[in-house]
Amino acid sequence: MTYGPARALPGDQIQITTNPDTEPFWLAAKEHKLTACECGACGHFRMPPTAVCPECGSREKKWPTLPGTGTIFSFAICNKNPKNGEDYVYVPVVVDIDGAPGTRLNANVSGCDAEDVHIGMKVVVDWTPIQDGWALPNFRKA
């Protein structure tokens, strides 16, 4: 089956909320920088960020800037806009994030045909402007 170009979801339809654990991620994203929560005590990365490290119980956090690259771990091809049901090809992905061992990020991939997306595909972060001046990390083929 041929789906055609994979697109990012329309940014005007996406809104986020932050909390003390996620706000550093979203503030970095607003500046088009990819980061992940790293334990300041043991170095364990975790996404989504949590108040306490699941490995050692520490509350210390670091937010290193990551290279913005990764590898597709999993994906699905969708052909309907989830908000209004209109025809719209998009590809949600789970990406293993480079520079943060064990960290995976849910996003979308765009800039290629949906049928060309595959597990193991190298990707680079691409930013989608969304509501309230925030930016959403998505990916495109590297």
Residues covered by each model-derived region:
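Short functional micro-motifs and their immediate structural scaffolds
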Residues: M47, E60-K62
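Residues immediately within or flanking Cys/His clusters that coordinate Zn2+
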Residues: K33-A36, T50
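Well-ordered alpha/beta subsegment
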Residues: L105-A142
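Glycine-rich active-site loops that engage anionic ligands at enzyme catalytic sites
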Residues: I72-G111, I119
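A broadly conserved sequence feature marking short terminus-proximal activation segments
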Residues: M1-L34, A100, A142
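Short coil-to-beta transition motif at edge beta-strands of beta-rich domains
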Residues: P48-E55, K122
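Short coil-to-beta-strand transition motifs
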Residues: K62-T71, V117-M121
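Short, cysteine/histidine-rich loop/knuckle motifs that typically chelate Zn2+
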Residues: E38-A41, V52-S58
